[in-house]
Amino acid sequence: MDPINQRIGDMLARIRATRPLIHHITNLVVMNDTANVTLHVGGLPVMAHDAEEVAEMVAHAGALVLNVGTLSPDWIESMLIAGRRANELQTPVVLDPVGAGATQLRTRTNLELLRSLRIAVVRGNGGEIGALSGEGGEVKGVESVSGPEDPLTAARRLAQTYHTVVALTGARDIITDGERVLTVNNGHIWLTTLTGTGCMATTMVAAFAAVERDYLLAAAGGLAMFGLAAELAAEKAHGPASFKVALFDQIYNLTPEQVANGARVVEGGS
């Protein structure tokens, strides 16, 4: 078995054994779904947003998710407080820059988080990563209309600028720390028929980052498992609604051995 695949399977086994708490400061649209995905992969979710409690809550967490999908000034303050405390504790922070490039507020907030905090992984679509990297990309609402001309260059530039891992997700997922590159080829087109699947993917990345300090591999592991679950779910589904149910079932039922055998992760950008 490929060593990367074996490590991905081992990560899932550690998640299931340790049940890390994943602290989300996330958007109102996906809160219930990402909480359930956290449970199904093997972690424990908490959605704590108030500035008075986030520093205390994140002290118990294995990872922190910052998702800017439904922004407000109070939530931005909470993200910065929680992120700084997570950095003090060396707890990984995973950023989902929902809609970056669509409005000045979203772009400005994401850049502030990247400059103010030590972000372990940025997980975004082509439009979002293109906008934040300066390589170009168009976002309509929160959906990517067009990505950068060279997605790998955009991901590398963002990773190098902010000393982070960037996971650019799409038909294939490109993951880089600015030097190393992994490509995940798992996934299914039906993921585009549901709201919040990108946010669910971010939650999967955070769960893997909670047990693996090589965040490049952690991001690949979370995305490979999520994509594999989608592939298997599509075999049982008849449309978006049944696909969502099957997706959650597959995330819950997949074993470390199945994930290790089914992950399609290659080194390099192709």
From Swiss-Prot:
Catalyses:
5-(2-hydroxyethyl)-4-methylthiazole + ATP = 4-methyl-5-(2-phosphooxyethyl)-thiazole + ADP + H(+)
Specify one Pfam family: HK
Instruction: Tell me the Gene3D superfamilies matching this sequence.
Output: 3.40.1190.20
Provide the GO biological process annotations: thiamine biosynthetic process; thiamine diphosphate biosynthetic process
Q: What keywords were assigned to this record?
A: ATP-binding, Kinase, Magnesium, Metal-binding, Nucleotide-binding, Thiamine biosynthesis, Transferase
The cofactor(s) it depends on are:
Mg(2+)
Give the binding site residues for ATP: 123, 169
Task: State the protein's purpose.
Answer: Catalyzes the phosphorylation of the hydroxyl group of 4-methyl-5-beta-hydroxyethylthiazole (THZ).
To which protein family does this belong?
Belongs to the Thz kinase family.
- List the molecular function annotations (GO) for this entry: ATP binding; hydroxyethylthiazole kinase activity; magnesium ion binding
This chain belongs to which protein, by name?
Answer: Hydroxyethylthiazole kinase
Protein residues bound to substrate: 47, 196
Is Transport included in the keywords of this UniProt record?
no
Cell membrane in keyword set: no
Q: Which residues form the signal peptide?
A: none
- What domain of life is recorded for the organism? Bacteria
Involved pathway(s): Cofactor biosynthesis; thiamine diphosphate biosynthesis; 4-methyl-5-(2-phosphoethyl)-thiazole from 5-(2-hydroxyethyl)-4-methylthiazole: step 1/1
What are its E.C. numbers? 2.7.1.50
